[in-house]
């Protein structure tokens, strides 16, 4: 089962600030995980040709693991990566994920295109969609200053988000 997901948001901060929060592993561990879950990078070599490994899931269990290969990274512009996710020895999904960062009058537009293949059905694809939506919203919240409200993410595939 395959699908191409398109999600985006606008964040009222300069592109350099948004990119810094995206590129920094420690920051990414904070904003990219849904509330009530945990994510730990075992390694992250964020550069073209680099790779990363992380575990995520319920705190204390981290039952899912992923391997990432950074295909191409252009600072403050885009990152293209492959990502494969397992639960133990069970292969769940693999995808080609592209993040794009562009200047807009309100700050920075962040877009995600995820060409995902699920080996376990539609729920994994919906989980990817929901995970990206949450990550975009939380990236905006992470970067929002005191008293600021970040914008939500939109799903350009016209599905409820």
Regions found by a protein language model. Name each.
Residues 1, 44-46, 60-64, 89-93, ...:
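A generic structural micro-feature
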Residues 1-38:
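Hydrophobic ligand-binding cavity/cleft-lining segments
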Residues 7-9, 41-42, 66-72, 95-103:
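Hydrophobic/aromatic beta-strand elements that line small-molecule binding cavities or substrate pockets
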Residues 15-16, 47, 71-78, 100-109:
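A short, structured loop/turn motif at beta-sheet edges
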Residues 18-22, 28, 52-54, 70, ...:
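Hydrophobic pocket/interface hotspot
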Residues 40-85:
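Glycine-rich portal/gate segments that line the openings of hydrophobic small-molecule binding cavities
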Residues 80-82, 86-134:
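Beta-strand/loop substructures that line and gate deep hydrophobic ligand-binding cavities in soluble
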Residues 116-161:
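A conserved amphipathic terminal alpha-helix motif
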């Amino acid at each position: 089962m395959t699908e191409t997901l398109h999600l985006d948001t606008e964040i009222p901060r300069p592109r350099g600030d948004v990119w810094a929060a995206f590129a920094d592993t420690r920051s990414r561990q904070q904003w990219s995980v849904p509330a009530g879950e945990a994510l730990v990078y075992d390694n992250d070599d964020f550069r073209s040709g680099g790779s990363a490994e992380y575990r995520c899931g319920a705190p204390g269990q981290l039952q899912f693991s992923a391997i990432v290969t950074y295909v191409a990274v252009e600072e403050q512009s885009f990152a293209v990566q492959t990502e494969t996710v397992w639960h133990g020895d069970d292969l769940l999904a693999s995808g080609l994920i592209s993040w794009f960062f562009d200047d807009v009058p309100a700050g920075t537009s962040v877009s995600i295109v995820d060409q995902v293949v699920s080996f376990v059905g539609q729920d994994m694809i919906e989980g990817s969609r929901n995970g990206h939506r949450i990550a975009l919203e939380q990236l905006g919240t992470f970067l929002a200053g005191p008293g600021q409200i970040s914008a939500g993410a939109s799903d350009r595939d016209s599905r409820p988000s």
